[in-house]
């Protein structure tokens, strides 16, 4: 773990220490509910790309899948951190918009569960990282809205150039933001390459959120909860609370996942 990550993860961080007594922090990860086939079976499943669990484990945490069920937000009281994972599109009805023909993969049960999880995590001050769809969920949970199909807005498909895989594009990170500190660039604004696969993005920012990274075409690529700083809980109790539109678990740079786990460990240290 880098010096910058330790500095910005939160107070009380110590290498190799998560929960009090040296236990590893428990990180809940929101998941899909889909039909899947394996071996002789074809059944309704709760699933998640393994790279999420592998990244949390490599960062020193214990990953726990959170199925999209009513009342799952009660799990927040038993977690040290939360990842709002990627997935299909959020139902535009959640932010008062009509359905765009390009909006796809809507799962109302997942929307309801993750919006409740996001709100509960912020209220409790749980260390929280939104990834891709997770950023969009966090924004909608705070009353924001989404662009439903970016090619219609920016005139290209550079944010989702590969079907079934990830492309790459640079993002500009705001100097002196929490994100810049985690990535080791707390000074002047810098550009970093990120793995990308999304066709929706933030339109109107939700209450208490600030944008901290953008692509050259103006699309918001990261948000942070205002007042959630390295010195502890901020407004509405939020401590480490940020989200990115890209997929850090799919890339080589794992500093965001390490910072989340470190911040989660500080809650029980």
Go through each PLM region and give its residues:
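N-terminal beta1-alpha1 cap of cysteine-dependent amidohydrolase-like domains
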Residues: 1-129, 139-142, 147, 151-186, ...
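The feature captures the ABC ATPase H-loop/switch
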Residues: 135
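Conserved loop-to-beta-strand segment in the C-terminal subdomain of adenylate-forming
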Residues: 239
């Amino acid at each position: 773990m880098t010096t910058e990550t330790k500095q910005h993860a939160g107070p009380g961080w110590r290498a190799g220490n998560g929960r009090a007594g040296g236990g590893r922090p428990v990180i809940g990860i929101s998941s899909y509910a889909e039909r899947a086939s394996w071996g002789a079976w074809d059944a309704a499943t709760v699933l998640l790309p393994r790279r999420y669990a592998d990244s949390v484990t490599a960062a020193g945490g214990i990953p726990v899948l959170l199925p999209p069920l009513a009342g799952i937000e009660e799990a927040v009281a038993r977690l040290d951190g939360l990842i709002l994972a990627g997935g299909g599109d959020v139902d535009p009805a959640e932010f008062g918009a009509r359905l765009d023909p390009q909006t796809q993969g809507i799962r109302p049960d997942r929307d309801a569960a993750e919006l409740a999880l996001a709100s509960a995590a912020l209220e409790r001050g749980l260390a929280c990282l939104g990834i891709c769809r997770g950023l969009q969920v966090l924004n909608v949970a705070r009353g924001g809205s989404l662009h439903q199909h970016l090619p219609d807005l920016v005139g290209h498909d550079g944010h989702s150039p590969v079907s079934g895989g990830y492309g790459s594009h640079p993002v500009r990170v705001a100097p002196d933001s929490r994100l810049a500190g985690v990535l080791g660039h707390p000074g002047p604004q810098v550009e970093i390459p990120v793995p990308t696969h999304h066709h929706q993005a933030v339109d109107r920012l939700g209450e208490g959120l600030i944008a901290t990274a953008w692509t050259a075409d103006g699309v918001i690529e990261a948000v942070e909860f205002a007042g959630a700083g390295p010195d502890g809980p901020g407004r509405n109790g939020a401590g480490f609370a940020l989200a990115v539109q890209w997929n850090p678990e799919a890339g080589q740079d794992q500093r965001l996942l390490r910072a989340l786990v470190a911040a989660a460990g500080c809650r029980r240290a």
